[in-house]
């Protein structure tokens, strides 16, 4: 769907419905567009996780890791919240960790067990997505009611055992991708199906848009992502999203580096999924307006993404038609040139944009950061500076923030 290529707001934090309203209003006030609102796991009851020493359930998960009952202290009226997102023309996704099955304290326990035919009342129902009857009951009684209220898609976040406990050799991640995608396909035949989940191995490109997991917020991570994203096209896995700004901090990191965050946003413009995110850590800040010296540069990056919307959507269509990723290594277009194999940090974004990331801070004296670029044959226009470059050579360029 077109909205997937817009700006996604996400952060693992205990936000209330009113705080989400404030967030969206603030984005509007500084002229930053948004299409997707991700509500991480605190949408549901997480009382077990908030204890000092959280207990574990019979599946080895911390109580509250899996959940399907809205946390009413934060969302007193889920229906009103979802109605508000619809009125704001926002698409909303909820985070799911389904490993602990259906617990007796969940609001959905009675309708699920009745539909499934579970006779051990008062006992949890194990996660068994590879059983048709279980899956049918799960989608019908657990997820469908929330979808009818206004949940647009699911952020599946499977992190537990790799293989099914019931079907030897079956990858849980791959099978979740398959079942959730086809559920979306059947639920709304008139809409393009879409899920957001983890890499499930070769062949998994058929189903999810994927996220690259819990990366550290550091320059080295940003430097690696262009190579990682582009070369994934070699296995037909072109739809990667990253936690822009980095997911988590090293122990010694004191606070968010606004320059790193800005450069990550600038790189993110030229990736398939454009999502800021982080873990629940008070040292990490994702509100752009907390960095007044960088805010307007950050805003320009997000607005550039929207300026490129027709181009991005066309690149996505080409990916659908040909299998060639939106981000692809330089050697796809220039296989005969040795240089194309020696610049893993740069890539083509669609057919006409050569992109890379600035992966070091600006010099304290000059205010510039260096970036070596190999230009293939032709004439190249630098959209950051307005300069023109003749192709067939490598240039060291210098950029302000």
Label the predicted regions.
Residues 1-401:
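Catalytic-domain carbohydrate-binding cleft regions of carbohydrate-active enzymes
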